[in-house]
Structures are given as C-alpha cells and as structure tokens.
Design a protein with these regions (language model features):
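Short C-terminal domain-edge/linker segments immediately following a structured domain
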Residues: 90-91, 109-111, 120, 127-130, ...
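Ankyrin-repeat TPLH-centered helix-turn motif and closely related helix/turn capping elements
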Residues: 100, 111-122, 128, 133, ...
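Charge-rich, low-hydrophobicity low-complexity segments
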Residues: 1-81, 128-254
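Extracellular beta-strand scaffolds
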Residues: 45-46, 56-57, 64-68, 75, ...
Length: 254
C-alpha cells in the first residue's frame, strides 16, 4: 500500500487527506488572535495560500504566491507578497493591507487601508470606507519575487478602483490617501524582526507614479460583479467610453 508522507513526517494512506493536511499545515493561517504570523522568502514558492478568522494579528507572506484568499479578518495588519494570479478579500474590517498581485477583489469589507500594487484595476463590492495608496513594501528578495510572479512593477493600476455598488460613480465607498496620510514605515519594524539586516536592505522597486500615462484617475470607475472575469472586464472597457489602460506590449499575452 502506498503511503504519502507530509513535510513534517506525518503519513497518510489517502492522497487527498495528505494534500489537505499539507495545505492546511504549510499554506494556511486560521483561527488566531494577537499573534504575529510569518512566511519568509522561499517558504511558499508560488503555492496558493488561505488566511481566515484572525483578529488583532500581524501577517506577513514574504514570498511569491498563487491565489490568496482572505476571509473574516479584523484589526489586523497584513503584508501579501507578489501573487501571480488573484487576491480575494472578504468580510474584513479595520485592517491595513500591503498587497502585490495581478488582480485584487474586495467584498463585504469596511474601514480598510490598502497599499497596493495591482497589474489590473482593483474591484470592490458591498464595501465601504476603503482607502487606497501606492504599494509600500521594500525588502531584498522582493524584486526577484515580482519576476517569479510575472508582474511588471512599473505597471501599477492601484488607483483605478472599480466599485460594483456605485452605479452613479459617486466614489462614496472609497478614496485615495493623500501622501501625508500614508504610513511609509508601517512595515519597517516587523520586517526587521522577520528578516536579517541584509535582507531588509533594498531600494524601492514599485515607483509611486506608475499608473497608465502617469495619470491618476479619480473618477474612472466601472461596475463589475465579484465573479466578473478579467476578460469580461476588459471587454466592457473596450465597449465603453472611458479611456483604456495602456499595458506594456511585453505583457499583452499575460
């Protein structure tokens, strides 16, 4: 009989049970309060990751990932390293996020600040009091992780927020942070605790001004459902009157 051995030595006869155990052991943070939860560089290596049911925690995923799902999190600071696909965040309140991803979607969230790199326009649904600012993450391995996630740090649509629940495009559910409101040092102490002094040393790789044509669109909102695919969203843009985002030609096939 074939046995499946998990990374901690636990053995399973059933392959599905082994896979579930491995994911929940190594790629999940769940049911924690007042804890610091860290995955360092090289510990995720492009795998999906789940975060759920946290309160008053600090979470740092300092590696490139596949899809990340975040559910039912309150009063927490969360750093999500480069995701090659999507980050889905639901039912979160009073949180601060630093996120790098290809696609970002919020649903049923309230009073959150988001320091963002997103290769596509971020989407919010049934969410309120959301604040957005440019990505503020800096550490030595970050540039390599952007490459591994196939993300161009110079193409950042952090400000192009689409609000599904604002048909009149009033912008009452979200706003852009003024630069003087940003906390540029929010991760400095946590990174110093999680990484070596050498690994903390780095230059900024995501420029502040890297939206299409250097313009920040404050009123260019569109409406999409939480399940709208990126292809459907892009087709809506092509059929509408709003200016289209300009993507680097090297990424047209992504």
């Amino acid at each position: 009989m074939q046995l499946f051995t998990a990374s901690d030595g636990t053995q399973f006869k059933d392959r599905n049970e082994w896979r579930k155990y491995e994911f929940e052991t190594n790629y999940t943070f769940r049911n924690k309060a007042q804890e610091t939860l860290i995955k360092g560089p090289g510990s995720i290596c492009g795998q999906p990751f789940d975060v759920s049911d946290l309160k008053d925690c600090v979470v740092m995923l300092l590696d490139h990932t596949d899809q990340v799902q975040v559910d039912h999190v309150a009063a927490t600071k969360m750093f999500l390293g480069p995701s090659s696909t999507s980050v889905f965040i639901r039912n979160c309140s009073d949180c601060v996020f630093t996120i790098a991803c290809k696609q970002l979607r919020f649903r049923d969230c309230n009073n959150c600040t988001v320091y963002l790199y997103s290769f596509t326009a971020p989407i919010i649904e049934t969410s309120s009091d959301m604040r957005f600012a440019p990505f503020n993450g800096i550490y030595r391995q970050l540039s390599k992780q952007f490459e591994e996630a196939r993300l161009d740090p110079h193409c950042n649509l952090w400000s192009q927020v689409y609000d599904f629940n604002d048909p009149n495009k009033s912008g009452h559910n979200w706003r852009l942070l003024r630069q003087e409101e940003e906390d540029s040092d929010i991760w400095k102490l946590f990174l110093q605790q999680a990484l070596s002094e050498e690994d903390c040393m780095s230059e900024e790789i995501v420029p502040r001004k890297c939206t299409p044509n250097g313009n920040v669109a404050l009123d260019g909102m569109q409406s999409f459902t939480f399940d709208t695919t990126q292809e459907e969203a892009q087709q809506t843009l092509w059929n509408g009157n709003e200016p289209l985002p300009i993507f680097p030609s090297a990424f047209n096939s992504v």
